[in-house]
Amino acid sequence: MPTIATEGSPNIVVVMNESFSDLTTYLEGYETSTDPMPYVRSLMKRDDVVSGTCAVSSDMGTGTANSEFEFLTGNSMAYFKGNTPYVQFIDAETPSLASLLAGRGYSTMAMHAYERAGYNRVKVYDRFGFEAYKGIEDFDVDLDYARGYPTDEANYRQLISYFETVDEPTVVLFFGDHEPRLSNEFYSSWFTDENDLDLETTAQLHKTPFFIWGNYSLSTESIQKGSVVSLNFYGFVPDGRVQLSPYQEYLADLRMEHPVITARYFTTAFGDKVGTAPSAFTDSIHEYQWLQYNCVFDRAHRIPGFYS
């Protein structure tokens, strides 16, 4: 949230929802007896809400920290295949959306409904520039689910309804971190061989819905309704009310050429999907790879002011 010094800048609430998915968007003929998310679906259809699809690098049912990494840093797991940067590489201060906003006068907090130490988050969030971090140990939560799980739909409605009544400008960015991992029998009923999928089907299995909602009229120039973007491009501060870093401006230009860059494929400006073999890389993707190296590893020679 912004401090007094940044009055007029919006509160920015980011909700990364565990395994949030809409199977009806890619399983032809898939039906449920009742719609499990009528409120969210209706919200995403509203003209004043920007919604679309996030292409994710993480595997089905796992890889939350890698989705966080892409969103918060603007870097892509295309160059970290088989790795978990939170555990292996974030061993010093690293530019992120949190440090950018802190530099713009915001106070920043991360919250996660898991143990604080999971995926090395205590150290990583500090190195990303978060001022505070709360894990499951910091909440007075009844973990006895014998009475059933809380209803997500009710919580989403409560969140949006609350901020509709708040006078301060507020924007909510909502997305899923990865697809859920369902039973092998479920997938075998839809795909001949889950381990031998074409690029189009692979893309369908690695995407989640997103929406951007504000309690004021949002500018939709950065991401259009119906867009398909990878998470490294989704972590933009929307609406132009907060100054972007030169790196974010670079990413905005790169997204025009390659809207999706994940660990599995990238897309061209025309929507064509291309595998991630290095021989297929364009000059722009090679340049992006170099900038990621400069950001994460080459700290002694990090471009001054470029990432902040």
For the regions a protein language model found, what residue spans apply to each?
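Solvent-exposed soluble domains appended to multi-pass membrane proteins
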Residues: 2-308
